């Protein structure tokens, strides 16, 4: 299995994420994080919400894979517990997660993904990545009946 988390963010070292990446390998899952922040995104965010959202879509589009499960994290989307999250991931070999910038996703981009919400609360990119990586590991623990999830 391969899970890739794409986000509109400047890169930052996250030690906890590295721990979850290592733990996911136990389940033969490569957990990869890719931070994207093209120059046009920085400029677009200064101009308008619509332009910013378009720049996020343009940054993410090369990574949308029709053969993979594409999941966009969106605050107004479906949410559920860790068991529901694990069911969503089960039986997929390639999963791409997308975390938009401050202005969120364009509606057109969301049409190409399944939308999922981690919470009603707003998180920084760093916190969202940590929560997502932990939930991916927890989902794998549920799927493979590992005692991490009790």
From Swiss-Prot:
Subcellular location: Cytoplasm
Cysteine pairings via disulfide bonds: none
One Gene Ontology cellular component: cytoplasm
EC number: 2.1.1.177
SUPFAM superfamilies (alphabetical): alpha/beta knot
Pfam families cross-referenced by the UniProt entry: SPOUT_MTase (PF02590)
Catalysis: reaction(s): pseudouridine(1915) in 23S rRNA + S-adenosyl-L-methionine = N(3)-methylpseudouridine(1915) in 23S rRNA + S-adenosyl-L-homocysteine + H(+)
Record's function text: Specifically methylates the pseudouridine at position 1915 (m3Psi1915) in 23S rRNA.
Protein name: Ribosomal RNA large subunit methyltransferase H
Organism this protein belongs to: Helicobacter pylori (strain P12)
